[in-house]
Amino acid sequence: NAAAEIFRIAAVMNGLTLVGVAIGFVLLRIEATVEE
């Protein structure tokens, strides 16, 4: 089913984006802590 495939890909992309944002936020917090 093409619609199901598109929905699955969209969900994966959304998940990767959220993971990327979370990793970036953690790295920023670590950098701020180290600088102090």
From Swiss-Prot:
Keyword Transport part of the UniProt annotation: yes
- GO BP annotations, alphabetical order: photosynthesis
Tell me if Transmembrane helix is a UniProt keyword of this record. yes
> Hey, which stretches end up on the Lumenal side?
1-5
Q: Where in the cell is it found?
A: Plastid, Chloroplast thylakoid membrane
Topological region Stromal: 29-36
User: Which domain of life does the protein's organism represent?
Assistant: Eukaryota
Q: Which family does it belong to?
A: Belongs to the PetM family.
Q: How does it assemble?
A: The 4 large subunits of the cytochrome b6-f complex are cytochrome b6, subunit IV (17 kDa polypeptide, PetD), cytochrome f and the Rieske protein, while the 4 small subunits are PetG, PetL, PetM and PetN. The complex functions as a dimer.
| Cited function | Component of the cytochrome b6-f complex, which mediates electron transfer between photosystem II (PSII) and photosystem I (PSI), cyclic electron flow around PSI, and state transitions.
Q: What protein name is recorded for this chain?
A: Cytochrome b6-f complex subunit 7
Q: Which organism is it from?
A: Spinacia oleracea (Spinach)
Lineage at the top is:
Eukaryota, Viridiplantae, Streptophyta, Embryophyta, Tracheophyta
| Gene that encodes the chain | petM
